[in-house]
Amino acid sequence: MKKVFSGEVYEVLPTSGGIIFSYCKDVIEEKALVGYKMITFENGRFTDIVNTIYLLTKFGNNYKSVAMQCDNYITEKSIVLPNGKVFLLSQDGTARLLGADAVSVWTGELKYRGCNATDIALYKNALWASFADCNVLLRYNLTTMREELRIGGNKSPFSKPSGLFVEGDTVMVSNAGSSKLTEVNLETYSVFDYEEFEEPVKQYVKVGDNRFVVLESGLYLI
């Protein structure tokens, strides 16, 4: 495991040839100054980028209109769907589906027993959500937004599941409580612990053959 960036990383976004991430650049009068960097795999270079590149990667072509509808576009979770629509999740559990024109077509909540969803991921025509405070994953029908399946709960294999990353027919769950990556097969629903770290795992992404985790101390290549 190799540390590639030291400090508080907010979010990592995969690109076709690397990753983009947002991070805490400085704290001034108790307010965080956010910076953005891009790593290009071909040459290994780190490049400072402007927030418009970050927003385009996160929200798609209509990023300006989408970002204006977010209370905080750094903490907002998003999925750009194949049809150009954008699904958004706020920290308070508010969820919205925006059309390709960034006009809201559905608004609701992703909550389970009073717990707010912490991350979302797309698999086929289903939306998966993690609930860190309840140690569960829920599957929703993306058309009806009805809950279809639950994994976890009592004697849960998860411990504060904070991040989701779909890879093939599996989803990698980042557990901030147990400091483990847990793999869930989305066809058989089998679960096993994939890897353990010395710090809480906030996020996992894989781009090509490169796997990254965000820990409290920074961004790592594993």
Regions found by a protein language model. Give the residues of each.
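A short beta-strand motif characteristic of beta-propeller blades
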Residues: 1-5, 62-70, 103-112, 146-156, ...
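Conserved beta-strand positions in repeat-built beta-propeller and related beta-rich domains
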Residues: 21-26, 80-81, 88-92, 129-135, ...
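Eukaryotic tandem repeat interaction scaffolds
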Residues: 105-167
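Short loop/turn segments that connect beta-strands within beta-propeller blades
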Residues: 41-44, 58-61, 99-102, 141-145, ...
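Blade-level signature of beta-propeller repeat domains, shared across WD40, Kelch, NHL, RCC1
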Residues: 202-222
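Repeated scaffold domains used in trafficking and secretory/extracellular systems
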Residues: 6-16, 50-54, 65-82, 113-124, ...
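WD40 beta-propeller blade core
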Residues: 96, 138, 180-182, 220
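Short, conserved, GDST-rich strand-edge loop motifs in beta-rich repeat architectures
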Residues: 24-45
